[in-house]
């Protein structure tokens, strides 16, 4: 019974990929196609009811190159409607800033808890850039995209969890993705292990579709990170 209660608690928090309380997070990533590393530092707070906010700062580093600032971002979400104890409807949004300009996104999450050990979140998101880029016709326009994401959350044990996360992107205006088409996929596999009430390390394997421009190869990425909860 104790194990079952633990799984129920973990299911509720993994549905939004967070645990309640304030935390700091550090993550390092390596892209095998571009030979680029990314360093991320994040602080955040998640309430018991599921609302949360986080601030993110990243830097990138390529071989024989200097460390460069990636982006700053602030994101928040709120569980607006819970018609049943299994179904949650949650809007969210974010704004970001990088050297080329600023942008943001709005999204709507629908989460359903099928069992104590499995729940699914479907996310509809619109990504907007406040700056203009040159499109396929040589005109200046905003390279915005529509995104559909799924989060398949599995509770393996009271400490170990796994998330399968496929995302589909479609470019709204006349722009191609790095694979040479108007649409692309990004797939993430996340493995988490809860050491204790403070430490939550994780490991991610990602496929970011094929790059036909600079690298002419599949974009695979490895991420290693950890959260510390206060």
Swiss-Prot record:
<keyword id="KW-0762">Sugar transport</keyword>
<comment type="function">
    <text>Outer membrane channel protein that allows an efficient diffusion of low-molecular-weight solutes such as small sugars and tetraglycine. However, the specific substrate recognized by the OmpL channel is unknown.</text>
</comment>
<keyword id="KW-0812">Transmembrane</keyword>
<dbReference type="GO" id="GO:0015288">
    <property type="term" value="F:porin activity"/>
</dbReference>
<dbReference type="GO" id="GO:0015772">
    <property type="term" value="P:oligosaccharide transport"/>
</dbReference>
<dbReference type="GO" id="GO:0006811">
    <property type="term" value="P:monoatomic ion transport"/>
</dbReference>
<dbReference type="Pfam" id="PF06178">
    <property type="entry name" value="KdgM"/>
</dbReference>
<keyword id="KW-0626">Porin</keyword>
<comment type="similarity">
    <text>Belongs to the oligogalacturonate-specific porin KdgM (TC 1.B.35) family. OmpL subfamily.</text>
</comment>
<keyword id="KW-1134">Transmembrane beta strand</keyword>
<protein>
    <recommendedName>
        <fullName>Porin OmpL</fullName>
    </recommendedName>
</protein>
<dbReference type="InterPro" id="IPR053713">
    <property type="entry name" value="Bact_OM_Channel_sf"/>
</dbReference>
<dbReference type="GO" id="GO:0009279">
    <property type="term" value="C:cell outer membrane"/>
</dbReference>
<keyword id="KW-0732">Signal</keyword>
<keyword id="KW-0813">Transport</keyword>
<keyword id="KW-0406">Ion transport</keyword>
<dbReference type="InterPro" id="IPR009331">
    <property type="entry name" value="Oligogalacturonate-sp_porin"/>
</dbReference>
<dbReference type="GO" id="GO:0046930">
    <property type="term" value="C:pore complex"/>
</dbReference>
<keyword id="KW-0472">Membrane</keyword>
<feature type="signal peptide">
    <location>
        <begin position="1"/>
        <end position="20"/>
    </location>
</feature>
<keyword id="KW-0998">Cell outer membrane</keyword>
């Amino acid at each position: 019974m104790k194990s079952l209660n633990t799984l129920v608690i973990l299911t509720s928090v993994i549905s939004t990929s967070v645990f309640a309380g304030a935390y700091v997070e550090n993550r390092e990533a390596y892209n095998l196609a571009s030979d680029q590393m990314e360093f991320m530092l994040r602080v955040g707070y998640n309430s018991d009811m599921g609302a949360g906010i986080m601030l993110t700062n990243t830097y990138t580093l390529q071989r024989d190159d200097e460390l460069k600032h990636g982006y700053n971002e602030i994101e928040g979400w709120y569980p607006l409607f819970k018609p049943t104890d299994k179904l949650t409807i949650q809007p969210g949004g974010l704004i970001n800033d990088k050297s080329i300009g600023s942008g943001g996104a709005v999204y709507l999450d629908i989460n359903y808890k099928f069992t104590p050990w499995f729940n699914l979140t479907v996310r509809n998101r619109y990504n907007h850039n406040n700056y203009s880029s040159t499109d396929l016709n040589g005109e200046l326009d905003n390279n915005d995209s529509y995104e559909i994401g799924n989060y398949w959350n599995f509770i393996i044990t009271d400490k170990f969890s796994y998330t399968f996360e496929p995302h589909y992107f479609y470019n709204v205006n006349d722009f191609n993705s790095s694979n040479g088409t108007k649409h692309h996929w990004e797939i993430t596999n996340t493995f988490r292990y809860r050491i204790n009430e403070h430490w939550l390390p994780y490991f991610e394997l990602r496929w970011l579709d094929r790059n036909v421009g600079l690298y002419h190869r599949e974009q695979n990425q490895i991420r290693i990170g950890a959260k510390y909860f206060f």
